[in-house]
Amino acid sequence: MDPPNSLQQGIRFGFHSSSFVENMEGSQDEDNLRLLASAASGSSRDTETPTDHASGSAGGAAGGQSESRPGPSGGGVADLFPELRRLP
């Protein structure tokens, strides 16, 4: 069964012209670009985030001391759950 107007074949039901869809997509791309730019500028101002990635996979801090960060990858399970420190 063919649509009533073959010129509007690629347009979804409910849209009567493609100009609205094109304008909507353009503003979405622009919004995404602004969001990406604000996230990038916000992370560059973060003083807690180290910018030196030369330590490699060893993950050691300068001076040979281990770097401690909050979260599951920093310090191990015993730091997250103090009751586990008592276990042998």
Swiss-Prot record:
Top-rank taxon of the source lineage equals Viruses
Query: Is Kinase given among the entry's keywords?
Result: no
Q: Which UniProt keywords apply?
A: Early protein
Q: Where is the composition biased (Low complexity)?
A: 34-44
Region: Disordered, residue numbers: 23-88
Q: Does the keyword Lipoprotein apply?
A: no
Q: Mind telling me which Pfam families this protein's record contains?
A: Adeno_E1B_55K_N
Kindly give any further remark recorded in the entry.
Residues 1-86 are identical with residues 1-86 of the E1B 55K protein.
The protein's name in its UniProt record: Early E1B 9 kDa protein
